[in-house]
Amino acid sequence: MKLITFSLWGDNPKYTVGAIRNAELAPTIYPGWKCRFYVGTSVPNPIVWQLEAFEHVEVVMMDVPGDWTGMFWRFYPASEPDVEVMVSRDTDCRLGAREKAAVDEWMAADKGFHIMRDHPHHGFPILGGMWGAKKGAFPTMREAIDDWSKTDAYGTDYEFFANVVLPALENEDVMVHDEFFVKREFPTPREGLEFVGEVYDESENNIEDHTRVLKNFLKNKIKK
């Protein structure tokens, strides 16, 4: 089984509508893959029903409303023996061709773990919605999550990856796509100011400041 995993809680349309939008995009961007949404009890029923209506979507209802520690739910499949490969994504981002080309390159390589960074602000070892793992790459993920002292704060998953996951990985088993910090280009040219991990609201508006930062970085890169 090939999985695209998401965590979802609350009623903020930035995330709930984003979840629906990613479910709509998945068959085109990731044909043959399934989406699995880990959903807190705080998500409105109509959103849950819409997700359940997609044939390629699995909804796993959690028994708690959800908070920032819910970010970890989507990481669980890395430990499941029937999951061939999984990629973890954010509901406020959008699946796209640029990331899929990077995933395809990783899938064809003899590497178990995949990391993407595609913006000057992506200065973390592993971003919770921009990584993937093949079966066996980190089989103790569930146990590691259970043992980690999670906090209800944005970025708690970044700390987990930096302190627990990354030190346990062997460098030769990791493929990184990142032109900013590692200097490994994505396999497809950047179209305009697009970037993997770009955040959108429920009306498909992005964050202008993020675009400006990327534009300035690329402009300076060309000058050099």
Spans of features found by a protein language model:
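A short acidic-Thr-Gly-centered motif at the start of a beta-strand
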Residues: 74-82
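Short aromatic/hydrophobic "clamp" motif used to bind/position activated sugar donors
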Residues: 86-88
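Short conserved active-site loop signatures built around small residues
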Residues: 92
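Conserved hydrophobic/aromatic beta-strand scaffold that supports enzyme active sites
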Residues: 77, 113-115, 130-132, 160
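Catalytic core and acceptor-binding pocket of nucleotide-sugar-dependent glycosyltransferases
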Residues: 121, 133-224
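N-terminal anchoring/stem segment of glycosyltransferases
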Residues: 1-64
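A short, glycine-/small-residue-rich helix N-cap motif at loop->alpha-helix starts
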Residues: 65-73
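Conserved donor-nucleotide/metal-binding helix-loop-beta segment in metal-dependent transferases, i.e.
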Residues: 95-126
